[in-house]
Amino acid sequence: MALPLAWALDLCFGEPRSAWHPVAWMGSSLAPVGRLLLRCSAGWAFFGGALAWLVGAAAIALGASALQSHLIELSPWFGAPLLAVVLKPMFAWRMLRDEVAGVEAALGASVEAGRAQLARIVSRDVTVLDAQGVRETAIESLAENLNDSFVAPLFWYAVAGLPGAAVYRFANTLDAMWGYRGRWEWAGKWSAHADDVLSWVPARLTAMLLRPCLRWRYWQLLRNEARHTPSPNGGWPMGAMALRLGVRLRKPGFYTLNAAAPSPSADHVAQALRFATHAAWVAVVLAMLATAARANWS
């Protein structure tokens, strides 16, 4: 019962305030560690980054496991709703949907307004983007974050319960903070690779949810498209979305997906939101079935 209740909370209320959000707590608690690691040599930065990840993941796994065990022992009328409240911050769909829809709405006013709205959900420089670039980036963010913020946490919840979802969100948060080249090269290397490992299966599952297709030729095409991105996982949901919409998606200077296709229009953004919404609902149903099966086996 916890998962459908958590899904209902997301649809009705979206994200809790940062002061009450466990993922925000993860980020704020590790920010001082990151600043310290940047002062270290490459070797010590790598060791410290790996140690911080391992200690943090272990603490979160143990805490989430203890909390889940305690809530399960309560009456289902109390335990399930409380577990849903704890589980809800581990994934985010409504916020992602609304932010991407807001980009297109802002573009209706001006390109500058569209850029400002887009900057809320991406870290890249948006000042150089025209209207087409804003739409392409919004669709890319929708597809990639459908995996990172929704499908992957649900996948790990289905596999390992609340500890699985919490550890994944920790790994993804640390990757978002430290998983960059340049000055974060060594401090964030462990975090980046850990996120790659934990996201490997969910990213391909997200691609399947965005475009269900059993034809081998399609998966060969998608695999080739996914290889264009520097991430071993991000190209799968983005490539699936590009092929499903029949549009080009690109990050200038880094990659182009479905290069021969036209740029997306406002209608394509609306279609992308519909496809992602359908994928999100299917992901919830699959996670519920998998969770029920795991409970029966245990």
Regions found by a protein language model. Name each.
Residues 1-166, 179-298:
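Hydrophobic alpha-helical transmembrane segments
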Residues 168-177:
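Alpha-helical scaffolding flanking metal-ion-dependent phosphate/phosphodiester catalytic sites
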